[in-house]
Design a protein with these regions (language model features):
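Short, solvent-exposed, charged loop/turn and helix-capping segments
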Residues: 72-99, 145-150
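Short, intrinsically disordered, charge-biased short linear motifs at domain edges
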Residues: 37-50, 74-81, 130-139
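Bacterial N-terminal signal peptides that target proteins for export
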Residues: 1-7
Length: 150
C-alpha cells in the first residue's frame, strides 16, 4: 500500500512538473508584447507631461484615458502570449504574472488620477510610490520572457 501511495505521489509530481500543453509561442506574439509595452511607456510619459501642463481636469483625464486604453492593449497582448504558449509552462506563467502586475499597476494609476484631480497630495504620493515599486517587478517578469518564451 505504501508503494502505491508513493508511486501515486511521484506520478502526480511528474504530471505537475511537465505541463501538457506548454509550447513555444511564435516570436511575433512575444514581440507584440514588447511593442505594446513601449507604447504604454509613451502613454505614461504623456501623463507625466499632462500633469505639469494641463490646466483642466478634462485635459488631464484625456491623457489618463489614453494610458488606460494602452494598458488594455498590453493586457490583450499578454493574454495572446499566454494562449500561444499553450496556457501552461514557464512562458504562460510569466505572461499571467505580468498581466496581474499590469492590472495592479493600472489600479494605481486610477488612484493617482483621482488623487491628482482632488488635489490630495498624500494620496497622490502613495499611489506614485506604489507605481515606482511595482514597475521594476513587472519589468523583471517581462524581461524573463527572453528565456521563458523561447
Amino acid at each position: 500500500m505504501r508503494f502505491i501511495s508513493l508511486a501515486a505521489a511521484i506520478l502526480a509530481a511528474l504530471v505537475l512538473a511537465i505541463p501538457a500543453g506548454a509550447k513555444t509561442p511564435p516570436p511575433s506574439v512575444v514581440a507584440n508584447v514588447g511593442v505594446q509595452l513601449a507604447k504604454f511607456g509613451l502613454s505614461v510619459s504623456a501623463v507625466d507631461g499632462a500633469t505639469s501642463t494641463c490646466k483642466s481636469v478634462a485635459c488631464l483625464h484625456k491623457s489618463y484615458v489614453a494610458l488606460y486604453a494602452q494598458g488594455h492593449s498590453v493586457d490583450n497582448s499578454l493574454k495572446n502570449l499566454w494562449a500561444a504558449s499553450g496556457q501552461s509552462g514557464s512562458c504562460a506563467s510569466a505572461a499571467a504574472n505580468a498581466g496581474a502586475g499590469m492590472d495592479s499597476l493600472l489600479k494605481n494609476f486610477h488612484s493617482l488620477e483621482s488623487a491628482t484631480v482632488k488635489n490630495n497630495v498624500s494620496a497622490a504620493k502613495a499611489a506614485a510610490a506604489q507605481i515606482r515599486t511595482k514597475t521594476p517587478r513587472i519589468t523583471a517578469v517581462i524581461n524573463s520572457f527572453k528565456t521563458k518564451c523561447r
